[in-house]
Amino acid sequence: ALPARVRRQAAVITYANDANAWFPYFLSYYGRLFGVENIFVVTPVPEAFSDFGLGGVWSVKGFPFDDAARASMMSSIANGCRNYYVWSIVCDVDEIIEPAPWLGVNLREYLSTCEDSVLYTRGLDVLQSAAEPDFDFRLRTCEQRSIAIPNTALYKPHLARVEVNYSGGFHFCSRLPEAGSLRGDLVTYHLKWACSSIRAEVQSSVMATSYSDVAIESYCRNSADPRGSHPSLRLSSGELIRLDHPLMSQFSDESLGALCWAPERGLYVGDFKVAPFLVKISK
């Protein structure tokens, strides 16, 4: 690897079915922070990404979608980028990672002083209320959406400065977390449920995709249906709390305490959990 003083701060690696839906917002957010030339995309339609000035585009054109194969490929890209970058950020195109608002810094500023090996984020499914308009790509998530549901399926090791291998969905990685990596400084805003019109775009792309596995095909197609609401919303108590509320900390601690480790598997958990309350994310 190049010396740390000449390596760039972060390589952002994602998978995109196409250059529509959430990709423009993803590109705008991470491009402002790290530069579009440091964003790398794995995609079945490489020709759609030729004009963005990206750091690299890996083609999987003609192949069925395979979650494990995708994770393996993106792990290899991230580990290769580590020769030129201090950090790798591996996430889906609808995942926006921000430091907790009370820290008062952006992600670039946060990483510039962080020395952890792997960082986990606290994941929130962002919701669109009936009164909220379509998503505006010029605004931050917290400037246009008010509520979210904490979801441990989104407590992911998105950021690493050491070699890691990711599981399908990037839920886990091959490295045991350090004490500081689970402190909750970072939040992932998951945008799957954040805009009904974009969900319709996503559904169109999902329905046109071929899959290698019946289970992942069923999950992708059902979860992209724009007519549905978040499946756990009806189970929520309706209680609305702040992100820094003790209940949120308790939920995170309990969830992270359920993580297990096995050398042959890495980090894993038997069941994901969705919080019984809502979180206020608007300012």
Predicted segments with their positions:
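Active-site-proximal specificity loops/subdomain of glycosyltransferases
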Residues: 44-91, 98-99
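Short, hydrophobic/aromatic alpha-helical segments in well-folded domains
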Residues: 25-29, 76-77, 106
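Residues at the starts of beta-strands that form the adenosine-phosphate
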Residues: 9, 37-38
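N-proximal low-complexity "stem/linker" segments adjacent to membrane-targeting elements
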Residues: 1-24
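Short, hydrophobic beta-strand segments that form beta-sheet elements in well-ordered domains
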Residues: 38-44
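Short, acidic, metal-binding catalytic loop of nucleotide-sugar glycosyltransferases
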Residues: 28-37
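Catalytic-site signature of metal-activated, phosphate-bearing donor transferases
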Residues: 70-72, 99-283
